[in-house]
Amino acid sequence: MWQNQNTVGYAEVDRLYIDYNANDVQVTVGRQRIAWGTSWVWNSTDLFNPLSILDFDYEELPGNDALRVQYYTGAVSKIEFALAPDRKKNKLTSAALISYNAFDYDFNFIAGIKNNRWITGFSWVGDIQGAGFRGEVTIQEKPERLSEYELLYSQFELQPISYSNKNLFSFVLSGDYTFPNSFYIHTEVLYNNIGKEENTALFSLEAKEIGLLSPSRFSVYQEFSYNISPLTRASAFGIYNPGDKSFVIVPSINYSVITNLDLYLISLIFDGKKFTQYGDYGTSFIARIKYSF
C-alpha cells in the first residue's frame, strides 16, 4: 500500500475461494491453504504452503491459488488431488495424497510434480504415552544444475548444491508434550542429504530455489513454553545448525490486556560466524498490539 523510510503499509488477500460439496466430494477453487504436512516447524510433504517458523507475524498462514479435489472414502480417510500454477516461475505443482488412519495414527502418502521434478513421500502423526509423535519423509528428483550460482561460489572455491547429482532426501522427526501444569516442550529435527555444513548462508537462495527447507545438512529445533498466569504465556524456541554452529533464539511473551486485545513481545537473537546460516542477522526486538474483531 505504501513504503517510505520509516513505515511500510501492506494488504494481503489470504483466502478467496469457491467451495463445492456433493456427497463425499469436495471441490475448492481459488486462494486457499493446502496443508499436507504433519510436523510443526519443517514440512517436506507440504508441497503447496510450506511454513516458516520465523515468520511469526503471519498468523493466517500463506495461501495458494489452486484447484483442490477431495474424495472422502471414510470418516478419517480420503483421496486428494491439488494443482497450483506458479505464474512467476512458469512452473506447476500438482500432486495427489492418500490419507488414512491405522493403529491410532494418521498416515499420508503423496506423489506429484514440483519445480518440474517428481517428488514422493509419506508422513504420520500420532502419540506415544500422551506425547505427540510426527514425521515426514520425501524423495525428490535431482535438480537441474543452476550454473548462475557458479560465479558467486567460485570466490570461495565452492560448488552449487545443485551440482551434487543426487536425488533429494529429506527427513523430519518431531515430538512434543504438555505437562499438567501447562509447561510445554517440543523438539524437532530436519535432515537434508545434500545440505551444506559450512558457509551455509551462501547457499540460502539456491536451496530455496531447488526446494530445500533449509540449506543446512542438519537442523535442530527446541521450544519451551509456560502459562505464567491465565492471561500471560511465556515461550522460547531456538534453532541450531550443528554443522556451522550458528543459531537463533526467539523468546516471547503474550499478554491478554483486555478481551480481544493482546500485547505480544518478541525478540529474535541470531548468532554465528560470518557466512553461517544464522550469523549475519543481528538481534531484533519487536512489540505488537493486536485487536481482534
Predicted features by range, described:
Residues 1-78, 272:
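Outer membrane beta-barrel
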Residues 9-14, 21, 61-65, 90-94, ...:
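Residues that define the transmembrane beta-barrel architecture of outer-membrane proteins
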Residues 226, 255, 261-262, 266-269, ...:
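Outer-membrane beta-barrel "beta-signal"
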Residues 29-31, 81-85, 109-113, 135-139, ...:
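Transmembrane beta-barrel strands of outer-membrane/channel proteins
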Residues 24-27, 76-79, 104-109, 130-134, ...:
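Repeated loop/turn-to-beta-strand initiation elements of outer-membrane beta-barrel proteins
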Residues 19-22, 71-73, 99-102, 113, ...:
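Residue-level signature of outer-membrane beta-barrel architecture
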Residues 125-239:
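Detector for outer-membrane/organellar transmembrane beta-barrel domains
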